[in-house]
Amino acid sequence: MEGTDPVNKKLAAALSGGAVLVLALSGCSDDSNDKLNSWAKQVCDKVQPQAKKIESANAAIQKETSDNSAPADVQKTDSKAFQDMSDAYKAIGDAVDKAGAPNVDGGEKKQQDAVKELDKISTSYADLKKQVDKLDTDDQAKFAEGLKGIAGSLDKLSQSGSDALKNLEEGDVGKAMAKQESCKSASATPSGS
């Protein structure tokens, strides 16, 4: 399936960039603010399984990419992966929302901005799922062209929208999150590094 292979590789590369958003929910350093530590634990405990879900979805797409799979198989894998990512980002947004504002200056705005951003990312992945579901798997050229468009959208998605998350996790919030075991394991790579 030579026509779709380069596009699949672009798709996989763009997905890897998107996963960085979730895995960035870990900071570095320490702090003694009990309320903030409690908030960080609540969020990190919810983020960990979602980060694993996103990592698994990325791995599935990358595996399908390296297999030279048939268009129908690529479509099925991508569709499920996009749905999983949509669900995961929505769950992370819900976790940040339910945790309330972190106990820092401007915490409420940071929290609200992050929730909006996570919901937007979730919706974007749901839209990508709809797009991939509509692709014509019987016509390899049309399928490759459709995948190329999806890869372009995915690339834009992976490059945009991380400002609110970065803003949420900066300073004391990032320090508190860095101390949480669940955030440490959520940011670990599959190789254990």
Where are these predicted regions, by residue range?
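Immediate post-signal-peptide N-terminus of mature secreted/exported proteins
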Residues: 30-84, 185-192
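Long amphipathic alpha-helices with heptad-repeat character
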Residues: 47-54, 58-61, 82-85, 118-121, ...
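Short, charged, amphipathic alpha-helical segments
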Residues: 37, 41, 72-83, 108-115, ...
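Bacterial N-terminal signal peptides that target proteins for export
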Residues: 2-16
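C-terminal motif of bacterial Sec signal peptides marking the signal peptidase cleavage site
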Residues: 23-27
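Extracellularly exposed regions in secreted/surface proteins, prominently low-complexity, repeat-rich
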Residues: 33-51, 141-193
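Short, solvent-exposed, charged loop/turn and helix-capping segments
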Residues: 90-115, 128-140
